[in-house]
From Swiss-Prot:
Catalytic site positions: 75, 119
Tissue-specific expression: Expressed by the venom gland.
SS bond list: 38-98, 54-144, 56-72, 71-125, 78-118, 87-111, 105-116
Species this chain originates from: Austrelaps superbus (Lowland copperhead snake)
Location relative to the cell: Secreted
Catalyzed reactions per annotation: a 1,2-diacyl-sn-glycero-3-phosphocholine + H2O = a 1-acyl-sn-glycero-3-phosphocholine + a fatty acid + H(+)
Protein name in UniProt: Basic phospholipase A2 S10-58F
UniProt: Ca(2+) binding residues: 55, 57, 59, 76
Main localization (coarse): secreted
GO molecular function, one term: calcium ion binding
Amino acid sequence: MYPAHLLVLLAVCVSLLGAASIPPQPLNLVQFSYLIQCANHGSRATWHYTDYGCYCGKGGSGTPVDELDRCCKTHDDCYTEAGKKGCYPKLTLYSWKCTGKAPTCNSKTGCKRTVCDCDATAAKCFAKAPYNNKNYNIDTKKRCQ
């Protein structure tokens, strides 16, 4: 083997090792973002909901700061209940469509239906709830006790 080939092989191995340490993104969250866009008609980018209040985004504690944050807490609770039924909400993919500018679940039964219902209900709740910029990226240690 030529030295240049060894360098290429080494570079590939190093890049694969680096990629192995990157945690995978839950597949369902991509689908959930599409449901949100369907429900709010694209009026607000999905990332606006990833660090909002005490419950929108990773984790959650304390009292929700407003109606939108309550939507996120309800969604978290729905995922918890789905998990108790043996579902893996963040990994469960389901069938849905955007009808009448609202997400509709096509999956009929089981975990796919349960998780889709959680996501569709949350997406519709997000679309109806007012968005308060002051509740984006708040200090959760102070406000979410």
